[in-house]
């Protein structure tokens, strides 16, 4: 039997990140903001005396079984399926192998080695509730993205999330002892689309490494990147996929240049391939050429954090035109560096950006609207400077230290309400009730 924790703070947490490693380079493949979130929050929890072991699927034969990411933070690479060539959509076929690897590691230790499970993304949640039941400890889950929400705002030509994912998410929501949402809007989405109990949801905002992402010398940053100091640089940072909508920025830039051919606008695209449709960097290059702005667009591969900070500092404006974002770490990182953000008015971007104070939110994705919004900023240097001055002050509200504190409070709530030795308490979800909801919704047949 697992002994309850007297101070309600776990000694050691098993963090599950099945589909992407926290050590992977953000901006390519399936690596993005979630990778940064998992690693940075783990580092901060370790600094607070909580050991963290992150389980992820091995994607190379060269992956060591265990890697130390930071003091108190281990990454365990679980062999589950082929190392390469397995699409994220096919990962459910390897969850049994992944679960076996996780349970096998725990079995090497005395009972109670892990005090809590924290799963990230629905695939990890499927593993998480099995580990929770096996070990008799609470499960906390962070969705990061939700199929029901993504499918409501698909980019043209993008592939809808499959029904199997939404059913899987419904199960995880029903099974979790606590749910962590990035914003109150995401909390509302969990209730509205998945029937989550609002009393089990904790809103914990992601953060940024404010020691790394801070204002600096713009000319020096441009010299480092080989950018002309006389140009107006608008930057996109992220995976090149329809969801992130880099094409929206390119089309708006082309429209703006058509309106003002003497414009000094330069578009900087920083990221690697992912997803479907406009996922290949060369497809975006072809789009720039077809729009007649190839000479005005610079492409860079994903950048290491210190170099990425220079990218933000070198930019006059950072664009986040996504069709869906649960938060938008790029927006916070850019503002922390003193760079205003122009973003789509979707999801958590309404929290990450203070429209009119640290940047501008744009409704919809029409080329004309984005071009006009861009023009309103780049044509008014004084306005842009005022936004830039306020941006770092806003970003100070979002740090990984704050995120870790919020997560630890969620862990405390999960722990005090967990009925050790007897499974979930009356305040926690039960598997039967969750599946009953699914059957009533027609998602699962009895």
From Swiss-Prot:
Reaction(s) catalysed (UniProt annotation): 1D-myo-inositol 3-phosphate + UDP-N-acetyl-alpha-D-glucosamine = 1D-myo-inositol 2-acetamido-2-deoxy-alpha-D-glucopyranoside 3-phosphate + UDP + H(+)
One GO BP: mycothiol biosynthetic process
Gene Ontology molecular function terms on file: acetylglucosaminyltransferase activity; D-inositol-3-phosphate glycosyltransferase activity; magnesium ion binding
Positions annotated to bind 1D-myo-inositol 3-phosphate: 19, 30-35, 88, 121, 145, 165
Keywords: Glycosyltransferase, Magnesium, Metal-binding, Transferase
Positions with a binding annotation for Mg(2+): 312-313, 315, 339
Cross-referenced CDD domains: GT4_sucrose_synthase
Residues that bind UDP-N-acetyl-alpha-D-glucosamine: 25-26, 33, 239, 244, 303, 325, 333
The EC number(s) this enzyme carries: 2.4.1.250
Subunit description: Homodimer.
PANTHER family for the chain: D-INOSITOL 3-PHOSPHATE GLYCOSYLTRANSFERASE, GLYCOSYLTRANSFERASE
The family this protein is said to belong to: Belongs to the glycosyltransferase group 1 family. MshA subfamily.
Function summary: Catalyzes the transfer of a N-acetyl-glucosamine moiety to 1D-myo-inositol 3-phosphate to produce 1D-myo-inositol 2-acetamido-2-deoxy-glucopyranoside 3-phosphate in the mycothiol biosynthesis pathway.
Protein name: D-inositol 3-phosphate glycosyltransferase
Species of the source: Rhodococcus opacus (strain B4)
């Amino acid at each position: 039997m697992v002994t309850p924790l007297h101070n309600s703070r776990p000694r050691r947490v098993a963090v599950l990140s099945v589909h992407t490693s926290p050590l992977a380079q953000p901006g390519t493949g399936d690596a993005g903001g979630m990778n940064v979130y998992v690693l940075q929050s783990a580092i901060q929890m370790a600094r607070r005396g909580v050991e963290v072991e992150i389980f992820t699927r091995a994607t190379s034969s060269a992956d060591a079984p265990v890697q130390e990411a930071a003091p108190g933070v281990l990454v365990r690479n679980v062999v589950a399926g082929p190392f390469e060539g397995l699409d994220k959509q096919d990962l459910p076929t390897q969850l049994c192998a992944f679960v076996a690897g996780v349970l096998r590691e725990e079995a090497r230790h005395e009972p109670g080695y892990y005090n809590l499970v924290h799963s990230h993304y629905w695939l990890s949640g499927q593993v998480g509730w099995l580990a929770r039941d096996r070990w008799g400890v609470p499960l906390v889950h962070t969705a990061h993205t939700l199929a029901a929400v993504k499918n409501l705002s698909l980019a043209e030509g993008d592939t809808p999330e499959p029904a199997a994912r939404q059913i899987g998410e419904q199960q995880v929501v029903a099974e979790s002892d606590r749910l962590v949402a990035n914003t109150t809007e995401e909390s509302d989405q969990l209730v509205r689309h998945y029937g989550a109990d609002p009393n089990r949801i904790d809103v914990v905002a992601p953060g940024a490494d404010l020691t790394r992402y801070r204002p600096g010398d713009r000319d020096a940053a441009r010299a480092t990147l080989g950018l002309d100091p006389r140009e107006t640089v608008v930057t996109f940072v992220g995976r090149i996929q329809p969801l992130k909508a880099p094409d929206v920025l390119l089309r708006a830039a082309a429209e703006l240049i058509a309106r003002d051919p003497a414009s000094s606008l330069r578009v900087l695209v920083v990221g690697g391939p992912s997803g479907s449709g406009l996922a290949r960097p060369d497809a975006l290059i072809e789009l720039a050429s077809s729009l007649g702005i190839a000479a005005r667009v610079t492409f860079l591969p994903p950048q290491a954090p210190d170099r990425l900070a220079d990218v933000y500092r070198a930019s006059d404006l950072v664009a986040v035109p996504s069709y869906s974002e649960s938060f938008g770490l790029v927006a916070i990182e850019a503002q922390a560096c003193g760079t205003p953000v122009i973003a789509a008015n979707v999801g958590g971007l309404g929290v990450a950006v203070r429209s009119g104070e640290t940047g501008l939110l744009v409704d919809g994705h029409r080329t004309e609207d984005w071009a006009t919004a861009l023009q309103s900023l780049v044509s008014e240097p004084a306005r842009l400077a005022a936004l830039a001055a306020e941006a770092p002050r806003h970003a100070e509200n979002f740090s990984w230290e704050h995120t870790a504190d919020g997560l630890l409070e969620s862990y405390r709530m999960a722990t005090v309400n967990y009925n050790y030795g007897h499974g979930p308490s009356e305040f926690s979800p039960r598997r039967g009730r969750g599946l009953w909801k699914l059957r009533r919704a027609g998602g699962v047949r009895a």
